[in-house]
Amino acid sequence: EGWTTNDTHQHTSEKGLTTLVKVTNHITITTRANRAMVRPPATSSNAEEHVSADGILGSIKSTLDGISGTYIICSRAGNGLHLYSRNKFGVTTPEKTLMSITTSEVNTIADLPSTCRHGYVVRVVNSEENQDDYFLKFKVVGIADEITQFGTYTRSAQVITITIANHGLQNEDQIILDCTEGGGDNSIYNVINRTDDTFQVQGDTSGTISTPQQCNVTPVRIGEGVWEEVVEPGKPIEIDNTTMPIALTRVLPGTFSINGGSNTSYPNGAFRFSYPDWGKRDCGDDITNPEPSFIGQTIQKMVFFRNRICLLSAENVILSRPNDFYNFWNKTAMAISNAD
């Protein structure tokens, strides 16, 4: 354990023969192990005893919280439990008719819960074919689409101090910490020692980071809400407008300052130069909603056809959405719409 490529070891046998061993290649093997086995206490067969989902879920949460070394954070989520760990893990149940498990993929939207963590993303696979996959993101009612805040952090031993101006968090609030720089541990933490512009969290590992490093902080918000279609996480969603055709818009006669110069009267009007907004990919992946084929190619001609802009590039004619002239992305990955 711990050997890497080019490591060497010298061994001398009992007969005095010295051998030098050099590691020429190595691979890391990941094995699976059970972190915990949890079951609620057995219920009585007495019909007079009341058995509730709240009682069963509360018992499972208490049992899981009481097991040390799992590094799994358990939170109540309506008639279910939300489990989080910075390390990969899986969950199984022998009673699939009584308990459903939602991870990063589901077979149908019928498998999705009505109460979940705000921002949770799943892939709906539908079938073995990739052409009908799409992605959904959970939005808790009454919470803004984007609640991630950007700040810096330092670390002393197990305590991480995060600085975000007017963060609005309270002690015991849960947050998801994403350390984009440095050696902080990405995980869910409880807020402690908060002030208006700083707060602390305590992790499981120790270290020292004196120079502030960048991080993203997302408050954990769990509640009832809806699932909305989104793009696959990590995929590019915008077109670089500096590489696309520009817009020239004629403006009425007036006095204008062009390129920072002095105000000049233009009695015949002028043309304003701008970069159009070429829309965003807000659903699908590279199969169900790929980048327009003119990306990386030369646009040879532009025409206007039935309320669409058409671009000729290489051997393709690429059409925008109707009445949305600069948007070349599909409207949805769930079906072929009239706008596609």
What are these model-derived regions, one by one?
Residues A36, D54-R76, T115-S127, Y134-V141, ...:
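Ser/Thr/Gly-rich low-complexity blocks that favor extended beta-strand/coil architectures
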Residues V23-N25, I29, N34, V38-A42, ...:
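Polar, low-complexity export/assembly segments characteristic of proteins
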Residues E1-T8, N25, I29-R35, R39-P41, ...:
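Acidic/polar, low-complexity linker and loop regions
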Residues T4, T12-E14, I295:
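Conserved loop/turn at the beginning of each blade in beta-propeller domains
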Residues R86-C116, I143-P253, Y266-P267:
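Small/polar beta-strand repeat architecture
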Residues T19-L20, K301:
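Conserved beta-strand position repeated once per blade in WD40 beta-propeller domains
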Residues T30, L177-C179, L312:
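Residue-level recognition of conserved beta-strand edge/terminus positions
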Residues P276-N307, L312-D340:
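Beta-propeller and closely related beta-pinwheel folds
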